[in-house]
Amino acid sequence: MRKRISAIIMTLFMVLASCSNQLEAEKLAAESKNTFFDSLVKIGQGFQDIFGIFGNAIGDALGFNAVKSDDKRSKVGEHFEGVGEGLKDTKIKLDELLKEVTAAPHADTTEVKSVINNAGAVLTKLIDSVAKLAGATKSEAPIGDAGTAQAAAATPADIADVNTVIEGVKKIIEVAEKSGVKIEKGTAGAQVANANGPKVLTNNAQADANSGPALAAEVDKADPWAMIDKIKMLKLLLHLLHLRLMMTPGQLATGSANAANNGTAATNADLAAAVALKAITKGGKFTQPAANEDGAVKVAAASAVNKVLGILDAIIRKAVNLELGKIKEAVKGIKYSEITGEATESGIDQPITNKSSN
Protein backbone atom coordinates (compact mmCIF):
# COMPACT_ATOMS: atom_id res chain seq x y z
CA MET A 1 0.00 0.00 0.00
CA ARG A 2 2.80 2.40 0.93
CA LYS A 3 4.61 1.52 -2.28
CA ARG A 4 1.48 2.31 -4.28
CA ILE A 5 1.03 5.65 -2.51
CA SER A 6 4.70 6.48 -3.07
CA ALA A 7 4.34 5.64 -6.76
CA ILE A 8 1.25 7.84 -7.04
CA ILE A 9 3.03 10.71 -5.29
CA MET A 10 6.06 10.30 -7.54
CA THR A 11 3.85 10.28 -10.62
CA LEU A 12 2.05 13.43 -9.49
CA PHE A 13 5.39 15.11 -8.82
CA MET A 14 6.63 14.24 -12.30
CA VAL A 15 3.40 15.48 -13.87
CA LEU A 16 3.59 18.74 -11.94
CA ALA A 17 7.26 19.17 -12.85
CA SER A 18 6.49 18.47 -16.49
CA CYS A 19 3.66 21.00 -16.48
CA SER A 20 5.91 23.54 -14.81
CA ASN A 21 8.64 22.98 -17.40
CA GLN A 22 6.12 23.25 -20.22
CA LEU A 23 4.71 26.48 -18.83
CA GLU A 24 8.22 27.87 -18.45
CA ALA A 25 9.05 26.87 -22.02
CA GLU A 26 5.86 28.49 -23.30
CA LYS A 27 6.65 31.62 -21.32
CA LEU A 28 10.16 31.77 -22.78
CA ALA A 29 8.80 31.19 -26.27
CA ALA A 30 6.28 34.01 -25.82
CA GLU A 31 8.99 36.31 -24.51
CA SER A 32 11.21 35.39 -27.46
CA LYS A 33 8.45 36.22 -29.91
CA ASN A 34 7.76 39.51 -28.16
CA THR A 35 11.44 40.40 -28.32
CA PHE A 36 11.50 39.43 -31.99
CA PHE A 37 8.47 41.60 -32.75
CA ASP A 38 9.93 44.52 -30.79
CA SER A 39 13.09 44.26 -32.88
CA LEU A 40 11.07 44.25 -36.09
CA VAL A 41 9.25 47.38 -34.98
CA LYS A 42 12.59 49.14 -34.48
CA ILE A 43 13.83 47.90 -37.84
CA GLY A 44 10.64 49.07 -39.54
CA GLN A 45 10.87 52.50 -37.93
CA GLY A 46 14.49 52.82 -38.93
CA PHE A 47 13.58 51.89 -42.48
CA GLN A 48 10.87 54.56 -42.63
CA ASP A 49 13.33 57.14 -41.26
CA ILE A 50 15.67 56.41 -44.15
CA PHE A 51 12.96 57.07 -46.72
CA GLY A 52 11.97 60.29 -44.98
CA ILE A 53 15.50 61.66 -44.80
CA PHE A 54 16.38 60.73 -48.37
CA GLY A 55 13.13 62.07 -49.82
CA ASN A 56 13.47 65.39 -48.01
CA ALA A 57 17.14 65.78 -48.92
CA ILE A 58 16.71 65.21 -52.65
CA GLY A 59 13.44 67.13 -52.69
CA ASP A 60 15.20 70.16 -51.22
CA ALA A 61 17.84 69.98 -53.97
CA LEU A 62 15.63 69.56 -57.04
CA GLY A 63 17.93 70.13 -60.00
CA PHE A 64 15.46 71.37 -62.61
CA ASN A 65 15.26 74.69 -60.73
CA ALA A 66 18.71 74.76 -59.15
CA VAL A 67 20.13 77.88 -60.80
CA LYS A 68 18.87 81.18 -62.15
CA SER A 69 20.26 83.09 -65.10
CA ASP A 70 22.13 85.59 -62.92
CA ASP A 71 23.62 83.01 -60.51
CA LYS A 72 27.31 82.25 -60.15
CA ARG A 73 28.72 78.86 -61.13
CA SER A 74 29.38 78.13 -57.47
CA LYS A 75 25.61 77.74 -57.13
CA VAL A 76 26.00 74.48 -59.05
CA GLY A 77 28.67 73.36 -56.61
CA GLU A 78 26.34 74.19 -53.72
CA HIS A 79 23.63 72.10 -55.35
CA PHE A 80 25.91 69.07 -55.60
CA GLU A 81 27.01 69.60 -52.00
CA GLY A 82 23.35 69.58 -50.94
CA VAL A 83 22.72 66.32 -52.78
CA GLY A 84 25.88 64.88 -51.24
CA GLU A 85 24.77 65.82 -47.71
CA GLY A 86 21.43 64.14 -48.31
CA LEU A 87 23.17 60.98 -49.46
CA LYS A 88 25.50 61.07 -46.45
CA ASP A 89 22.57 61.44 -44.04
CA THR A 90 20.88 58.51 -45.75
CA LYS A 91 24.06 56.43 -45.41
CA ILE A 92 24.26 57.23 -41.69
CA LYS A 93 20.67 56.05 -41.18
CA LEU A 94 21.42 52.96 -43.25
CA ASP A 95 24.35 52.13 -40.98
CA GLU A 96 22.08 52.54 -37.95
CA LEU A 97 19.55 50.19 -39.54
CA LEU A 98 22.29 47.63 -40.10
CA LYS A 99 23.07 47.71 -36.37
CA GLU A 100 19.40 47.17 -35.52
CA VAL A 101 19.18 44.25 -37.94
CA THR A 102 22.39 42.68 -36.63
CA ALA A 103 21.11 42.89 -33.05
CA ALA A 104 17.70 41.37 -33.82
CA PRO A 105 17.30 38.09 -31.86
CA HIS A 106 15.68 34.88 -33.10
CA ALA A 107 16.08 35.79 -36.76
CA ASP A 108 18.44 35.09 -39.62
CA THR A 109 19.54 38.49 -40.87
CA THR A 110 22.27 37.31 -43.22
CA GLU A 111 20.42 38.19 -46.42
CA VAL A 112 19.19 41.52 -45.07
CA LYS A 113 22.68 42.54 -43.99
CA SER A 114 24.02 41.64 -47.42
CA VAL A 115 21.40 43.79 -49.14
CA ILE A 116 22.04 46.71 -46.76
CA ASN A 117 25.79 46.46 -47.32
CA ASN A 118 25.26 46.52 -51.09
CA ALA A 119 23.03 49.58 -50.78
CA GLY A 120 25.66 51.24 -48.60
CA ALA A 121 28.28 50.62 -51.28
CA VAL A 122 26.04 52.26 -53.88
CA LEU A 123 25.56 55.31 -51.65
CA THR A 124 29.29 55.57 -51.03
CA LYS A 125 30.02 55.61 -54.78
CA LEU A 126 27.34 58.21 -55.40
CA ILE A 127 28.65 60.37 -52.56
CA ASP A 128 32.15 60.22 -54.02
CA SER A 129 30.97 61.13 -57.53
CA VAL A 130 28.81 64.01 -56.33
CA ALA A 131 31.70 65.36 -54.23
CA LYS A 132 33.93 65.43 -57.32
CA LEU A 133 31.25 67.24 -59.29
CA ALA A 134 30.92 69.79 -56.50
CA GLY A 135 34.68 70.39 -56.55
CA ALA A 136 34.68 71.06 -60.30
CA THR A 137 31.82 73.57 -60.19
CA LYS A 138 32.95 76.14 -57.62
CA SER A 139 33.87 79.04 -59.90
CA GLU A 140 32.64 82.49 -58.84
CA ALA A 141 32.10 83.49 -62.47
CA PRO A 142 28.48 83.97 -63.61
CA ILE A 143 26.64 81.04 -65.19
CA GLY A 144 26.30 82.93 -68.46
CA ASP A 145 29.68 84.67 -68.37
CA ALA A 146 30.52 86.22 -71.74
CA GLY A 147 33.15 88.50 -73.19
CA THR A 148 32.58 92.22 -72.70
CA ALA A 149 35.48 93.79 -74.59
CA GLN A 150 34.98 94.95 -78.15
CA ALA A 151 34.60 91.89 -80.41
CA ALA A 152 35.55 89.61 -77.51
CA ALA A 153 36.06 85.99 -78.54
CA ALA A 154 34.83 82.95 -76.65
CA THR A 155 37.29 81.39 -74.20
CA PRO A 156 37.51 77.63 -73.59
CA ALA A 157 36.36 75.95 -70.41
CA ASP A 158 39.00 74.39 -68.18
CA ILE A 159 39.74 70.92 -69.57
CA ALA A 160 40.50 69.39 -66.15
CA ASP A 161 37.16 70.53 -64.74
CA VAL A 162 35.27 69.38 -67.83
CA ASN A 163 36.97 65.99 -67.54
CA THR A 164 35.95 65.79 -63.88
CA VAL A 165 32.33 66.49 -64.81
CA ILE A 166 32.45 63.86 -67.57
CA GLU A 167 33.89 61.30 -65.16
CA GLY A 168 31.35 62.16 -62.47
CA VAL A 169 28.39 61.80 -64.82
CA LYS A 170 29.74 58.52 -66.22
CA LYS A 171 30.22 57.09 -62.71
CA ILE A 172 26.76 58.07 -61.52
CA ILE A 173 25.21 56.45 -64.58
CA GLU A 174 27.34 53.32 -64.19
CA VAL A 175 26.32 52.91 -60.54
CA ALA A 176 22.66 53.60 -61.32
CA GLU A 177 22.54 51.09 -64.17
CA LYS A 178 23.98 48.39 -61.92
CA SER A 179 21.21 49.17 -59.42
CA GLY A 180 18.62 48.63 -62.15
CA VAL A 181 17.94 52.16 -63.37
CA LYS A 182 17.08 52.44 -67.05
CA ILE A 183 19.02 55.33 -68.57
CA GLU A 184 17.13 56.81 -71.49
CA LYS A 185 19.01 57.88 -74.62
CA GLY A 186 16.51 60.58 -75.46
CA THR A 187 16.18 62.30 -78.83
CA ALA A 188 19.35 64.08 -79.89
CA GLY A 189 17.79 66.21 -82.62
CA ALA A 190 19.27 67.54 -85.83
CA GLN A 191 22.58 69.18 -86.66
CA VAL A 192 22.74 72.86 -85.64
CA ALA A 193 24.30 75.41 -87.98
CA ASN A 194 26.88 77.84 -86.64
CA ALA A 195 24.55 80.83 -86.79
CA ASN A 196 21.86 79.07 -84.75
CA GLY A 197 23.79 78.77 -81.52
CA PRO A 198 27.32 77.36 -81.80
CA LYS A 199 28.63 80.82 -82.71
CA VAL A 200 27.90 81.95 -79.14
CA LEU A 201 30.12 79.19 -77.74
CA THR A 202 33.02 79.25 -80.19
CA ASN A 203 33.23 82.43 -82.25
CA ASN A 204 36.46 84.43 -82.37
CA ALA A 205 34.60 87.75 -82.52
CA GLN A 206 31.33 89.24 -81.35
CA ALA A 207 28.35 87.03 -82.11
CA ASP A 208 25.99 88.02 -84.90
CA ALA A 209 22.57 89.46 -84.22
CA ASN A 210 19.91 86.90 -83.22
CA SER A 211 22.50 84.23 -82.35
CA GLY A 212 21.74 84.61 -78.62
CA PRO A 213 17.99 84.03 -78.95
CA ALA A 214 18.73 81.22 -81.42
CA LEU A 215 20.90 79.50 -78.81
CA ALA A 216 18.21 79.93 -76.15
CA ALA A 217 15.64 78.38 -78.50
CA GLU A 218 17.88 75.39 -79.23
CA VAL A 219 18.53 74.76 -75.53
CA ASP A 220 14.85 75.16 -74.69
CA LYS A 221 13.85 72.33 -77.03
CA ALA A 222 16.76 70.05 -76.07
CA ASP A 223 15.92 66.65 -74.58
CA PRO A 224 17.69 66.50 -71.17
CA TRP A 225 18.10 62.70 -71.40
CA ALA A 226 19.84 63.13 -74.76
CA MET A 227 22.09 65.80 -73.22
CA ILE A 228 23.15 63.42 -70.45
CA ASP A 229 23.70 60.67 -73.01
CA LYS A 230 26.00 62.95 -75.00
CA ILE A 231 28.06 63.74 -71.89
CA LYS A 232 28.16 60.06 -70.95
CA MET A 233 29.49 59.13 -74.39
CA LEU A 234 32.32 61.69 -74.30
CA LYS A 235 35.88 60.49 -74.00
CA LEU A 236 38.15 62.37 -71.64
CA LEU A 237 39.61 65.44 -73.32
CA LEU A 238 43.38 65.14 -73.48
CA HIS A 239 44.04 67.88 -76.02
CA LEU A 240 42.29 70.20 -78.42
CA LEU A 241 43.62 68.78 -81.68
CA HIS A 242 41.52 67.36 -84.49
CA LEU A 243 38.48 69.54 -83.87
CA ARG A 244 35.78 68.63 -86.35
CA LEU A 245 33.33 70.90 -88.12
CA MET A 246 30.47 68.97 -86.48
CA MET A 247 31.49 69.16 -82.84
CA THR A 248 30.74 67.21 -79.68
CA PRO A 249 29.88 68.91 -76.37
CA GLY A 250 33.47 68.60 -75.17
CA GLN A 251 34.88 70.24 -78.29
CA LEU A 252 32.34 73.03 -78.24
CA ALA A 253 32.98 73.72 -74.56
CA THR A 254 36.78 73.52 -74.54
CA GLY A 255 37.79 74.43 -78.09
CA SER A 256 39.64 77.70 -78.62
CA ALA A 257 37.84 80.38 -80.59
CA ASN A 258 40.31 80.27 -83.46
CA ALA A 259 40.23 76.48 -83.74
CA ALA A 260 36.47 76.13 -83.32
CA ASN A 261 35.33 79.24 -85.17
CA ASN A 262 32.43 78.63 -87.57
CA GLY A 263 31.95 75.08 -86.25
CA THR A 264 28.53 73.49 -86.07
CA ALA A 265 27.00 71.21 -83.44
CA ALA A 266 26.56 67.57 -84.43
CA THR A 267 23.08 67.58 -82.88
CA ASN A 268 20.81 69.80 -80.80
CA ALA A 269 21.69 67.71 -77.72
CA ASP A 270 25.44 68.17 -78.37
CA LEU A 271 24.96 71.93 -78.42
CA ALA A 272 22.85 72.07 -75.24
CA ALA A 273 25.23 69.75 -73.37
CA ALA A 274 28.16 71.95 -74.43
CA VAL A 275 26.39 75.02 -73.07
CA ALA A 276 25.96 73.26 -69.73
CA LEU A 277 29.60 72.14 -69.57
CA LYS A 278 30.85 75.63 -70.38
CA ALA A 279 28.44 77.27 -67.94
CA ILE A 280 29.40 75.22 -64.86
CA THR A 281 33.19 74.92 -65.12
CA LYS A 282 35.81 77.58 -64.63
CA GLY A 283 37.52 79.50 -67.41
CA GLY A 284 34.89 79.26 -70.11
CA LYS A 285 33.28 82.38 -71.50
CA PHE A 286 30.71 82.74 -74.22
CA THR A 287 31.36 85.00 -77.20
CA GLN A 288 30.49 88.65 -76.71
CA PRO A 289 26.75 88.70 -77.40
CA ALA A 290 25.21 90.96 -80.00
CA ALA A 291 23.59 94.13 -78.69
CA ASN A 292 20.89 93.46 -76.09
CA GLU A 293 21.28 89.68 -76.36
CA ASP A 294 23.27 88.98 -73.20
CA GLY A 295 20.05 88.10 -71.38
CA ALA A 296 19.23 85.40 -73.93
CA VAL A 297 22.67 83.85 -73.49
CA LYS A 298 22.26 83.79 -69.70
CA VAL A 299 18.83 82.16 -70.03
CA ALA A 300 20.27 79.53 -72.37
CA ALA A 301 23.09 78.79 -69.92
CA ALA A 302 20.80 78.44 -66.90
CA SER A 303 18.31 76.29 -68.82
CA ALA A 304 21.04 73.91 -70.03
CA VAL A 305 22.52 73.59 -66.55
CA ASN A 306 19.15 72.91 -64.92
CA LYS A 307 18.34 70.20 -67.44
CA VAL A 308 21.58 68.37 -66.69
CA LEU A 309 21.21 68.76 -62.92
CA GLY A 310 17.58 67.68 -63.04
CA ILE A 311 18.31 64.43 -64.87
CA LEU A 312 21.30 63.64 -62.65
CA ASP A 313 19.09 64.12 -59.58
CA ALA A 314 16.43 61.87 -61.11
CA ILE A 315 19.00 59.15 -61.81
CA ILE A 316 20.39 59.34 -58.27
CA ARG A 317 16.89 59.27 -56.77
CA LYS A 318 15.92 56.21 -58.83
CA ALA A 319 19.12 54.36 -57.92
CA VAL A 320 18.73 54.93 -54.19
CA ASN A 321 15.00 54.14 -54.23
CA LEU A 322 15.71 50.85 -56.00
CA GLU A 323 18.31 49.94 -53.38
CA LEU A 324 15.92 50.84 -50.56
CA GLY A 325 13.25 48.76 -52.26
CA LYS A 326 15.57 45.76 -52.19
CA ILE A 327 16.08 46.30 -48.45
CA LYS A 328 12.33 46.51 -47.96
CA GLU A 329 11.79 43.12 -49.60
CA ALA A 330 14.62 41.54 -47.60
CA VAL A 331 13.28 42.93 -44.32
CA LYS A 332 9.80 41.62 -45.15
CA GLY A 333 11.36 38.15 -45.40
CA ILE A 334 12.70 38.14 -41.82
CA LYS A 335 10.77 35.47 -39.91
CA TYR A 336 10.74 34.15 -36.38
CA SER A 337 12.94 31.23 -35.37
CA GLU A 338 13.14 29.41 -32.04
CA ILE A 339 16.91 29.35 -32.30
CA THR A 340 18.65 32.22 -30.54
CA GLY A 341 20.75 34.49 -32.72
CA GLU A 342 20.95 34.08 -36.47
CA ALA A 343 18.76 31.19 -37.46
CA THR A 344 16.53 30.68 -40.47
CA GLU A 345 14.23 32.95 -42.45
CA SER A 346 11.13 30.85 -41.85
CA GLY A 347 8.11 31.42 -39.70
CA ILE A 348 6.22 34.71 -39.46
CA ASP A 349 6.29 37.24 -42.30
CA GLN A 350 6.47 40.89 -41.28
CA PRO A 351 5.07 43.47 -43.73
CA ILE A 352 6.74 46.87 -43.99
CA THR A 353 5.18 49.71 -45.93
CA ASN A 354 6.71 52.84 -47.39
CA LYS A 355 5.90 55.70 -49.71
CA SER A 356 8.82 55.30 -52.06
CA SER A 357 8.65 55.68 -55.80
CA ASN A 358 11.13 55.46 -58.59
From Swiss-Prot:
The keyword Lipoprotein applies. It is found in: Cell outer membrane. The keyword GTP-binding does not apply. A lipid is attached at C19 (N-palmitoyl cysteine). Keywords: Cell outer membrane, Lipoprotein, Membrane, Palmitate, Plasmid, Signal. GO terms for cellular component: cell outer membrane. A lipid is attached at C19 (S-diacylglycerol cysteine). Residues 1-18 form the signal peptide. It comes from the Bacteria. InterPro entries: Borrelia_lipo. It is a lipid-anchor. The Vlp and Vsp proteins are antigenically distinct proteins, only one vlp or vsp gene is transcriptionally active at any one time. Switching between these genes is a mechanism of host immune response evasion. Belongs to the variable large protein (Vlp) family. Beta subfamily. Genes for both Vlp and Vsp families are on (usually) unnamed linear plasmids in B.hermsii HS1. This is Variable large protein 9. It comes from Borrelia hermsii.
